[in-house]
Each structure stands twice: as C-alpha cells, then as structure tokens.
Amino acid sequence: MARTNTKNASVWKDGFLFVGNHLALDFLNTQPVQDGEAMELLPDFASLLGWFQTAGLLSPRDVEDLKRHWGQSAEARRTVEAMRGLRERLRKEILTWEDGGTPQYSTIDELNQLMAAYPMCARLRRRNRKQLLTELYFKRQRPEDLFAPLAQAAAMLFANANHDRVRKCDQCVLHFVDTSKKGTRRWCSMQLCGNRQKVATYAGRRRSASVER
C-alpha cells in the first residue's frame, strides 16, 4: 500500500483512507502499512478529530469546540490511546470473523458497555416543509463521547454484515466490505493495490514467455 501520490490521491481524503465501505473498517484502516512499517494516522487528538470530521461524524465547529476545550488535556490523550486499543482488539476479532469465527464474549461485552455509556440517540427533524425524518446523533461534549459512533458501527458490522464479503486486501493490511455484484473484489482499491498486482502479473507473464522462447 503506497501513500498519497498523483496516481492514488483520490482514495485519500485529508490524509485518511476511506476504502472500507463501512465506518468500522475505515476506522480499522487508520493504521496502514508502508514499506513494511505501520503508519499511525491517529497519533494525537487533533488527528482523531480530523478523521471524525472527514468521516462526516463531526462538523468543523464541533472539531474547533473539542479542540478548544480538550485539545491538550490528559482526557484527550487517554481517549486517543483507548481508541487505538479498541482498534487493535477489533482488528484481531475481524480477522477471525472474516475466516468464519465469532467475536469473543469479551469483545461483545466491551461493545455493549461502550454503547451503554456513549449511546447513539435518535431525533426528529424536518427534511422540508412537508416531510420529517429521523437521524442519529451523539453527544460531543467530552473526548470519550467519540466512542458512540464507533462502538455502534462495530456492533452493526458483526450483526448485519455478511462475513464472506468482509475481507482483508490481498496485497496490504486494509479491510473492506465487498459490495461488488459478483463478490470478487480482492483489493482495497484499484489505485492502491489492484493496478500494482496487475502490473506484477503482466510482468510475470512476460518473463515466462521470454523463458519459453
């Protein structure tokens, strides 16, 4: 998996990758690998807020408010560490789940506790003068409130997604939900890994043809 350049810039958004087709997997993908080294895309609270904003979970005003009140706090640092810990536990569970296993009871309990402590709430608002709609939201008062959408997303992934369609890229550590009609997607994205694999396959065929001559 190569980082941003002219060819693959379209799959990066504000320094983050959104190729998972699911919020929980996009969160998992905040630690990609480049040249054999893990890249930490959530090194601090500002980066975490940036990811939430790019994912459409926080508005610019939300980000500024949280930065102003909590940016340099111990609570913000603890939240970042806790988020990264959750990410690694989910990574292990999702790898097992993709192979047909089931999440451990400890993970189920952790997600239930997070959803109870930091719930997603529903509210009614106007779509236009004649129509109403409901939308989900979460409190944005403290750093740990950010667990709300992530815990729900992980729970929804395990409960509703077809694990046969949730995969790790053949060429890197990124995960995705395969939404293709045939269910044959193998790469995180064509720009990042698909084209590279096709070039390698083509080069291999050319080498084989040269040897046979």
Protein language model annotation of sequence segments:
Residues 168, 198-201:
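Residue-level recognition of specific faces of alpha-helices
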Residues 166, 185, 190, 196:
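Residues immediately within or flanking Cys/His clusters that coordinate Zn2+
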Residues 1-168, 212:
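Short helix-coil boundary/hinge micro-motifs
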Residues 173, 189-194, 203:
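Cys/His-coordinated zinc-binding microdomains
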Residues 168-177:
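Acidic interhelical loop/turn segments
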Residues 203-213:
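Contiguous alpha-helical segments
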Residues 178-179, 199:
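Short, non-ligating residues that shape and space the ligands of small metal-coordination modules
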